Design a protein with these regions (language model features):
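Aromatic-lined carbohydrate-recognition surfaces of secreted/lumenal glycan-active proteins
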Residues: 230-234, 368-407, 459-461, 515-519
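Amphipathic, heptad-repeat alpha-helical segments
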Residues: 40-74, 114-175
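C-terminal segment of N-terminal export signals and the immediately downstream linker at the start
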Residues: 24-45
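Aromatic-rich peripheral "rim/lid" segments of glycoside hydrolase catalytic domains that contact
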Residues: 335, 349-366, 373, 442-449, ...
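N-terminal substrate-binding region of glycoside hydrolase catalytic domains
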Residues: 61-90, 226-283, 288, 294-318, ...
């Protein structure tokens, strides 16, 4: 499904339609990204300005123009935060008394990544009207991460894990540079210089402690029989089918089957007319996978994104939509039933893929209908809710995938909580985790937050680019990036394999996560640029394929406890 605008949201910038970048060493005036609040009451107070100091050595860009605010629960909210010549400023937090800010900042030696500044866990409050406060952005980012690492390290050690000398080296270096920055707080540039180094070491400390603790937990808990290694299975129709089945079954025991209405080539043939199914293509694939002992899940039967809704669905009245959804769900589950392990009830309906502009109440009603019909027809099939955009930056953009939002928007956490509170008894909460423009600690903290909702979880779609390939260079299909690298170093086969190993390790270590599904299987049929595990339909294995096979084999050999 390459080229879809929802996915460009992730791979281009972690936002959609945000515009240009900020310059490497000067702050350019940027258009305000926010739309006026529908509430007319004036909630503005004084202003806080976070001033960036460009101590980086490279050409940049070093700061992306989208910033957004989050509350004490790390939930985004629409504010008037903006970029201008002064820096990152906010003067209206919409009556949220305590908040943090989120920016994408280039940390040379680690990556160009989104980071939260939260005043070391104490959060920020706006000054009174007419007042202004100026803060050193570099220092605030460093302080916030160093202090969080202190608390996180203490929590991780409670189960008996002892951090290695490597972890403590990064922790201690970050603490020392933070202290140096604090001592120079009245010397903005020198303080920023120390803080930048402290932040770099703190980010490495964050990731090292999480991955090391995850490996400790994996050994401690022993063999798991309740975890699926999954992948999108469209490549069955993109390469020789026997080659696909041999290579797929070598590393995966779970498959994602696309039921999208429009926009995915051969896999767009499921409906010949509204609600009229043509199941043969998927039926063959599922049967072939079942013969190999691979379980399958339906995906994208209900995905209301601009890319993938035909005009007849886009123009459908709500009452007709309910009738259509009931019939399509009933016919699909009657036909496939227990051939499937799971059925995705809705995809990305948390106010991102909402091109039909459904109200929250309508979303709840539609989700309940699909869930209940699926349960009544095929009670043995698990029902899942799949969410994207884990940090919900779109809330600050006040937009759906292609349109202005007409209702207050919700994060995946808030949306899922709302449908649980409404009594919708789905089985599995799914969260996409394409490279989230966040470090690994942020990623696992977000997943731990979602786990508090009490549902078993899967990572539904996971992936990162694989860097330039012979094919992409020869055919100019993937341009060489002129921006700072995003994670550790520029994307290549080795970096892709490193990230895959780390995210699968974190997922496998958490008993509430029961699957991790890679997207995609083969290049050049990818979403993330060269993000497949095979170089081409001929089946040449990339380093990430070998790495995944190795870690799965290692975990399969763990003793049962």
């Amino acid at each position: 499904m390459s080229g879809l605008s929802r996915r460009k949201f992730i791979k281009s910038s972690a936002i959609a339609g945000a515009g240009t970048f900020l310059a490497s060493n000067t702050m350019l005036a940027a258009p305000e990204l926010l739309l006026k609040s529908k509430v007319n009451k004036n909630t503005s107070l004084g202003e806080i300005v976070f001033v960036p100091h460009y101590v980086q050595k490279g050409r940049g860009p070093h700061l992306y123009e989208l910033a957004w605010a989050t509350d004490k629960e790390w939930e985004p909210f629409l504010s008037n935060i903006k970029m201008d010549a002064k820096g990152v400023s906010i003067s209206d937090s919409k009556n949220i008394d305590k908040f943090g800010i989120n920016v994408r900042w280039n940390v040379e030696g680690f990556g160009w990544t989104n980071i939260t500044a939260d005043n070391g866990g104490e959060f920020y409050s706006l000054p009174s009207s007419g007042k202004s406060q100026s803060l050193n952005l570099n220092y605030e980012l460093c302080k916030s991460r160093v202090v969080r690492n202190r608390h996180r390290l203490s929590d991780l050690k409670k189960s008996g894990w002892i951090p290695s000398a490597e972890v403590m080296m990064y922790v201690n270096l970050s603490e020392q540079f933070y202290e140096d920055a604090r001592q120079k707080i009245n010397d903005d540039f020198n303080s920023a210089n120390f803080a930048q180094s402290g932040l770099m070491y703190a980010l490495w400390a964050s990731e090292k402690m999480e991955v090391e603790k995850a490996k400790f937990d994996i050994v401690l808990r022993g063999k798991r029989d309740d975890f699926f290694f999954g992948c999108d299975a469209r490549s069955f129709y993109q390469m020789y089918q026997d080659t696909f089945l041999d290579l797929f079954s070598e590393v995966f025991n779970y498959a994602n089957i696309t039921f999208v209405a429009k926009g995915d080539g051969i896999m767009s043939d499921y409906q010949t007319a509204p609600g009229v199914i043509q199941p043969e293509t998927r039926e063959l694939l599922i049967k072939k996978l079942n013969e190999r002992g691979i379980k399958s899940q339906e995906r994208l039967l209900f995905w209301f994104h601009d890319c993938c809704i035909p005009d007849w669905l886009r123009d459908m009245k709500y009452d007709d939509l309910l009738k259509y959804a009931e019939k399509l769900t009933k016919d699909t589950m009657k036909h496939f039933g227990d051939m499937l392990y799971a059925m995705e009830v809705v995809n990305e309906l948390h106010d991102w893929a909402n091109e039909l502009q459904l109200s929250p109440e309508q979303i709840t009603e539609l989700t309940r209908l699909i869930n209940d019909v699926a349960k009544s027809v095929a009670p043995n099939v698990k029902r899942t809710i799949n969410n994207c955009c884990p940090y919900a930056e779109y809330v600050q953009m006040n937009s759906y995938s292609k349109k202005k939002a007409v209702f207050p928007q919700r994060s995946p956490f808030k949306f899922t909580k709302d449908i649980i509170d409404a009594g919708i008894d789905f089985d599995i909460l799914e969260q996409q985790m394409y490279y989230p423009y966040r470090d690994l600690q942020d990623s696992i903290l977000l997943l731990e937050k979602l786990s508090t909702l009490g549902k078993p979880m899967q990572l539904s779609e996971v992936g990162v680019p694989g860097g330039p390939s012979n094919y992409s260079v020869r055919n100019s299909t993937v341009p060489f990036s002129k921006e700072p690298y995003l994670w550790h170093k520029p994307w290549n086969e080795h970096t892709q394999a490193d990230w895959l190993e780390d995210i699968y390790t974190l997922a496998f270590s958490k008993p509430f996560i029961h699957a991790s599904n890679w997207f995609d299987f083969v290049d050049p049929y990818y979403f993330m640029e060269n993000g497949g595990l095979l170089q081409s339909p001929k089946g040449e294995k990339k380093e990430a394929y070998h790495r995944l096979k190795k870690i799965r084999n290692n975990w399969d050999q763990l003793p049962r406890k």
